[in-house]
């Protein structure tokens, strides 16, 4: 067993690992809280790098504020969830090593499809679908500030660009995507582009601003207000759009926002060993026939520009993302206490 898997399998070692990271970065929480007071569109301040500082002893739960959001929702007082939550939607039969090795008994995911894939591999855990995680995140803005922002933006198109993984860069035909965005731009007062924190660079900023687009980022992957910002931004939008499938589709559909996927070839490049590892996993997943079938079903469902979600789109999203599996505060409490 590798050192990493040894840590995953021991609650005490996971706890110690977290404590060491907290001692190394004593100002982490203060910095995250400071960023939580920034304007939603202050993407440069929100998307600055953060160190790898863990408070959730199940490491996946530190990503995007998933563990923090569940604890806020359920009123759990301790500093971690006693369950492992898949940090995003994985298409196909792939199951992370941490899910197989974790010390915890409960695994949480989106819907029945993922539940079945996990249970086919992990025999000694209980798997519970809880629907789109964004439901459990608190809003970034209160009602008054939200109303002010919506008035300022007017009718809004929100576009999610396909993003890189850890240690990777991502590229696609930006000119072609902008052409498709502009083909429906007349229907909106504001166009907002959502960029992952590590994909922001002067070249892309200049190009998007030249088109008159606003730039938004949900923040760093370890910023526990990530989902809160994303939730508020999606709620501010009237239409959503992307150039690939992904977890954003679960969140947009759950928040009842129409979505259009402009399918593009997405190219990734490894920047370091972490990137090489992630690309190897992505390549393995892409060869999975089930992965291909699941992605294709979603691409087909969202291939056309529609001004509202169709019944077929809702059905497909419920199938994969568990829209009907939203849990009460009491239910979440019992799963993560």
Residue spans of the language-model regions?
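Active-site and donor-binding regions of nucleotide-sugar-utilizing enzymes
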Residues: 3, 7-8, 12-129, 138
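Short active-site oxyanion
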Residues: 102-107, 190-191, 236-239
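C-terminal non-catalytic accessory extensions
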Residues: 102-106, 113, 118, 319-337
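Short His-Asn-centered micro-motif
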Residues: 108-111, 160-162, 193-198, 218-219, ...
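Carbohydrate-associated surface elements
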Residues: 133
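Conserved catalytic-core segment of nucleotide-activated headgroup transferases in glycan assembly
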Residues: 138-204
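Donor nucleotide-activated moiety binding/catalytic core segment of transferases
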Residues: 199-255, 259
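Catalytic binding pocket for nucleotide-activated donors in carbohydrate/polymer assembly enzymes
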Residues: 247-330
């Amino acid at each position: 067993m590798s050192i990493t898997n040894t840590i995953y399998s021991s609650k005490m070692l996971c706890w110690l690992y977290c404590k060491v990271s907290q001692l190394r970065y004593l100002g982490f929480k203060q910095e995250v809280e400071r960023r939580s007071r920034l304007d939603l569109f202050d993407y440069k301040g929100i998307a600055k790098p953060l160190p790898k500082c863990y408070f959730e002893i199940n490491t996946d739960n530190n990503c995007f504020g998933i563990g923090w959001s569940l604890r806020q929702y359920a009123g759990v007082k301790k500093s971690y969830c006693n369950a492992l939550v898949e940090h995003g939607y994985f298409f196909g039969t792939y199951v992370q090593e941490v899910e197989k090795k974790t010390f915890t008994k409960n695994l949480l995911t989106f819907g029945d499809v993922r539940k079945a894939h996990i249970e086919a591999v992990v025999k000694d855990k209980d798997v519970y679908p809880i629907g789109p995680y964004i439901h459990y995140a608190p809003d970034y803005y209160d009602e008054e500030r939200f109303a002010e922002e919506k008035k300022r933006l007017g009718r809004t198109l929100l576009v999610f660009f396909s993003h890189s993984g850890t240690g990777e860069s991502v590229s696609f035909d930006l000119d072609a995507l902008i052409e498709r965005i502009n083909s429906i731009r007349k229907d909106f007062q504001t166009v907002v582009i959502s960029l992952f924190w590590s994909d922001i660079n002067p070249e892309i900023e200049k190009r998007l601003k030249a088109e008159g687009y606003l730039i938004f980022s949900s923040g760093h992957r370890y910023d526990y207000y990530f989902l809160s910002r994303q939730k508020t931004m999606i709620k501010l939008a009237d239409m959503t759009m992307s150039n690939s499938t992904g977890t954003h589709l679960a969140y947009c559909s759950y928040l009842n926002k129409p979505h259009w996927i402009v399918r593009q070839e997405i190219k990734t490049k490894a920047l370091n060993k972490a990137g090489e590892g992630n690309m190897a996993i992505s390549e393995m997943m892409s060869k999975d026939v089930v992965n291909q079938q699941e992605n294709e079903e979603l691409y087909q469902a969202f291939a056309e520009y529609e001004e509202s979600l169709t019944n077929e789109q809702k059905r497909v999203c419920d199938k994969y993302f568990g829209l009907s599996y939203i849990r009460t505060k009491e239910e979440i409490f019992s799963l993560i206490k």
